[in-house]
Amino acid sequence: MTEQTPAVSEERGYRKALRGIVVSDKMDKTIVVEVQDRKKHSLYGKVMKTSKRVKAHDEENTAGVGDRVRIAETRPLSASKRWRLVEVVERAK
């Protein structure tokens, strides 16, 4: 008799992906990306622009200041890095 063990599938959970503009690349293998979002005020309904700056891991130092990039959420890589560079969408002019 053969036992059939269920296949163990370790699927990753949902990971966020953002687009933003590189504002700093002075660190080694790290870029700072500014991500903009629009949020509606809960009481008054006005649409406001919000922005946040996140540090992302850039393994090959490919992104430069002004580049439009896509980043994805990942495990903590350092005290402040929780994002990684997926691709450079558009180079700075």
From Swiss-Prot:
Query: Which GO cellular component terms are attached?
Result: cytosolic small ribosomal subunit
Q: Give the matching Gene3D superfamilies.
A: Nucleic acid-binding proteins
GO MF terms held by the record: rRNA binding; structural constituent of ribosome
One BP term from GO: translation
Q: What InterPro entries does the database record attribute to this sequence?
A: NA-bd_OB-fold (IPR012340), Ribosomal_uS17 (IPR000266), Ribosomal_uS17_bact/chlr (IPR019984), Ribosomal_uS17_CS (IPR019979)
Q: Quick check: keyword Calcium in the entry?
A: no
Query: Does the record's keyword annotation contain Ion transport?
Result: no
Q: Which UniProt keywords apply?
A: Ribonucleoprotein, Ribosomal protein, RNA-binding, rRNA-binding
Give the SUPFAM superfamilies listed for this entry: Nucleic acid-binding proteins
Q: Give the disulfide map.
A: none
Domain of life according to the entry: Bacteria
Subunit structure, per the record? Part of the 30S ribosomal subunit.
**Which function does this protein serve?**
One of the primary rRNA binding proteins, it binds specifically to the 5'-end of 16S ribosomal RNA.
Per its UniProt record, what PANTHER family does this chain match? 40S RIBOSOMAL PROTEIN S11 FAMILY MEMBER, SMALL RIBOSOMAL SUBUNIT PROTEIN US17M
Q: Which NCBIfam families match?
A: PRK05610.1, uS17_bact
Q: Which family does it belong to?
A: Belongs to the universal ribosomal protein uS17 family.
**Could you tell me what this protein is called?**
Small ribosomal subunit protein uS17
Organism of provenance: Micrococcus luteus (strain ATCC 4698 / DSM 20030 / JCM 1464 / CCM 169 / CCUG 5858 / IAM 1056 / NBRC 3333 / NCIMB 9278 / NCTC 2665 / VKM Ac-2230)
